[in-house]
């Protein structure tokens, strides 16, 4: 596969829907997964987020962000916006969070913009970049001809002093057709509320870590959401043969009333699923399975060998099942660490809405993939690496 396929005509733009105060939220999100030589069953992971929001003010993990201006779009589709670049790094033992949390203005443009380098060839194919206007290189972009993505990041000095790497540089090349072709979803519910999402499910990644090069994989998404954020489960797995699996289960739960980041609340005892789904790019069968049925069970790790997060809380185990008329997949995965982002946004009459967004590097304990050709298990793969999300509260 010589280039990344798909429609990237709006990948570098967020003016798809008119902004809604306190509800519009935009971001690019990249997750890089590389092997952990000390714990082969785990993976080291880097997450980077470039984000902006239509809001008078919001507190992000204790830091108040007050936008200095609204998003501006020029006549050529270039965007300048206030926002933040946020990141975490998990080295297989310790979670460095936030690895970076930096306020800045960001410029985003595509290869049709007059400011795109003149020497770049193959214009109009969706190449582009988001460029934070900072002294450090914190850029993320797609090279001309859609040959590869790049990402550059410099860690906060306080995290470097604690043992985090200083500089990260990632090149992401296409893997194979199904996971490395951008998938687009857009849905408008009414009153301009809805979502606009584009994903590249699987890429080969080369991570340069303070001069050391490591081969792994990457997941990329660009999201615009214009609706209240409700509790959800989401997760994904990359397999050594290039297969990709994900699951998503938004749910109605008393956990939407939670106001802090403490897990295992008694309010999180009941979850009513709301349109769960899943997707499996199956490399060995050379096909894609879509699932409209999904269940997610959450339980604490207990007993010898159970793991805890940096705050001492027991980490979860997820039991996930997705199925359709041909294929059924059941997995048991446990979190090996936890990164959390805590959002508090003033609303009306002095009320404050809250969302805790947790990200968990995963270790796969069991997997069963059953279809018309037989049963596959974890033993059929050299490695499986992944990440899961669990969010509670409601942000509006």
Where are these predicted regions, by residue range?
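Structured soluble/peripheral alpha/beta segments that form catalytic or ligand/cofactor-binding pockets
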Residues: 1-396
């Amino acid at each position: 596969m010589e280039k990344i396929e798909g429609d990237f005509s709006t990948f570098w733009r967020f003016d798809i829907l008119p902004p809604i105060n306190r509800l519009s939220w935009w971001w690019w999100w990249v997750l890089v997964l590389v092997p952990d030589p000390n714990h082969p069953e785990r993976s080291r992971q880097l997450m980077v987020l470039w984000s902006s929001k239509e809001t008078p003010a919001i507190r992000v993990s204790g830091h108040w962000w007050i936008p200095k201006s609204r998003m501006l779009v020029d006549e050529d589709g270039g965007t300048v916006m206030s926002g933040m670049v946020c990141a975490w790094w998990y080295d297989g033992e310790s979670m460095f969070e936030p690895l970076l949390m930096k306020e800045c203005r960001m410029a985003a443009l595509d290869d049709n913009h007059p400011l795109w380098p003149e020497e770049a060839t193959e214009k109009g194919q969706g190449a582009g970049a988001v460029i934070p206007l900072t002294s450090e290189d914190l850029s993320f972009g797609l090279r001309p001809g859609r040959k590869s993505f790049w990402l550059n990041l410099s860690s906060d000095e306080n995290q470097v002093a604690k043992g985090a790497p200083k500089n990260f540089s990632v090149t992401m090349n296409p893997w194979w057709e199904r996971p490395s072709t951008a998938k687009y979803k857009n849905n408008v519910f009414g009153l301009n509320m809805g979502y606009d999402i584009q994903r590249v499910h699987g890429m080969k990644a080369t991570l340069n870590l303070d001069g050391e090069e490591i081969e792994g994989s990457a997941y990329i998404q660009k999201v615009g959401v214009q609706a209240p954020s409700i509790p959800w489960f989401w997760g994904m797995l990359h397999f050594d043969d290039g297969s990709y699996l994900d699951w998503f289960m938004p749910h109605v739960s008393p956990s939407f009333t939670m106001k802090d980041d403490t897990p295992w609340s008694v309010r999180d005892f009941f979850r009513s699923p709301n349109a769960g789904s899943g997707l499996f790019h199956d490399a060995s069968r050379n096909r894609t399975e879509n699932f409209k049925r999904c269940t997610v069970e959450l339980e604490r790790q207990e007993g010898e060998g159970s793991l805890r997060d940096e705050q001492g809380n027991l980490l979860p185990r997820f039991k996930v099942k997705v199925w359709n008329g041909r294929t059924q997949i059941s997995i048991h995965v446990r979190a090996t660490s936890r990164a959390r982002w805590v959002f508090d946004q003033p609303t009306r009459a002095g009320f404050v809405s809250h969302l805790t967004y947790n990200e968990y590097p995963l270790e796969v304990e069991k997997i069963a993939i059953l279809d018309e050709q037989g049963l596959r298990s974890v033993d059929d793969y050299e490695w499986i690496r992944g990440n899961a999300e669990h969010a509670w509260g409601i942000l509006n």
